[in-house]
Amino acid sequence: MPKPLVYRVQNHAARRLHHDFRLEIGVALKGWAITRGSSLVAGEHRLNVAVEDLVLDYIDFEGVIAMGYHGAVLMLLWDRATGEPDGDCAAALATGSAALTLQGEKLIGRWRLERMKSRLCEEHVSWLLVKSHDAARERGDLDILEEQPRSVLTGRTVKDIAATAA
Ligand code: MN
C-alpha cells in the first residue's frame, strides 16, 4: 500500500485568483497552478502549470506576504487532506501520468494528473488535472468554488484576509 501523500489547495490571489494544487513528493511540496480552479465535475479537464516547489514549512500558510517590488501575495488555505496515490507517485509523475484519490474537505474522489506534450522552448510544463467519473458532480451542478470559497483553516474569505492586511 503506497504511503499517503499530504495534499493542499491554496487559493492564491495574484494578478488573477487561481488555485495552487500541492502534493508532498519527497521533501518538498510539488505545485501546479490551476488557472480556473479545481473542479468536482466528472470528466472535467483543468489546465494546470507546474510551479516552483515549496518547502514543507509553508504547508499550512494562510495570509499575506509582502513581496517588495512585486506587491503582496495573498494565500487562503482552501482544502487539505492526505491523498492516496496509485503506487509510487513520484515515479508516476516522472512518466507523465499519476492517479490519486483525495479525501479532502472539498475535493473528494479520484483525479488524474496528465502531462501534456510540450514544445522544448516552453518555459513551464503544462498538465491536466482530470476528474474521474466517480461520485462526482455533473455539469450544471453548483460549482464547488462558488459553494465553498472559505478557508478550511479559519473560515475566512479572500476578502476577509485582504482586510487584515490593509
Ligand atoms: Mn500560485
Residue ranges and their predicted role:
Residues 1-166:
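A charge-rich, low-complexity, intrinsically flexible signal that marks solvent-exposed coils, linkers
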